[in-house]
Amino acid sequence: MLSRAIFRNPVINRTLLRARPGAYHATRLTKNTFIQSRKYSDAHDEETFEEFTARYEKEFDEAYDLFEVQRVLNNCFSYDLVPAPAVIEKALRAARRVNDLPTAIRVFEALKYKVENEDQYKAYLDELKDVRQELGVPLKEELFPSSS
């Protein structure tokens, strides 16, 4: 319909088909870009650490295969905080439930890179020592002492 109107009316034809300078297009795009932008994250409340812990404990309990365990681990460690020892324990139990020892070992590797210093890492290891022994999860440092 629009094409018929353009070609019927010579005045519209000349104004619509006329080349416009590039600066006008850039200004116009900039204005429209700012008008159309929205803040989607503004509508959500911030999640507390306790809510984060409860959510990931539940997700690790519900993980039914290796893909789900690794997906939840990836999401859990993508936040800008270190998961609680209870979450790490659930992650280890989920990895062993799906019978994947390498993922359980990688949980500790991820934890090592996530904590701020070596003392925090040692505190996590002390906290999770019984769980590690129960599930038979060695550390990478124990398996390959020369590479760490």
UniProtKB/Swiss-Prot annotation:
This is Cytochrome c oxidase subunit 6, mitochondrial. It is found in: Mitochondrion inner membrane. Keywords: Heme, Iron, Membrane, Metal-binding, Mitochondrion, Mitochondrion inner membrane, Oxidoreductase, Transit peptide. The gene is COX6. It is a peripheral membrane protein. Component of the cytochrome c oxidase, the last enzyme in the mitochondrial electron transport chain which drives oxidative phosphorylation. The respiratory chain contains 3 multisubunit complexes succinate dehydrogenase (complex II, CII), ubiquinol-cytochrome c oxidoreductase (cytochrome b-c1 complex, complex III, CIII) and cytochrome c oxidase (complex IV, CIV), that cooperate to transfer electrons derived from NADH and succinate to molecular oxygen, creating an electrochemical gradient over the inner membrane that drives transmembrane transport and the ATP synthase. The lineage of its organism: Eukaryota, Fungi, Dikarya, Ascomycota, Saccharomycotina. One of its GO terms (biological process) is mitochondrial electron transport, cytochrome c to oxygen. Residues 1-40 form a transit peptide. Belongs to the cytochrome c oxidase subunit 5A family. Component of the cytochrome c oxidase (complex IV, CIV), a multisubunit enzyme composed of 12 subunits. The complex is composed of a catalytic core of 3 subunits COX1, COX2 and COX3, encoded in the mitochondrial DNA, and 9 supernumerary subunits COX4, COX5A (or COX5B), COX6, COX7, COX8, COX9, COX12, COX13 and COX26, which are encoded in the nuclear genome.
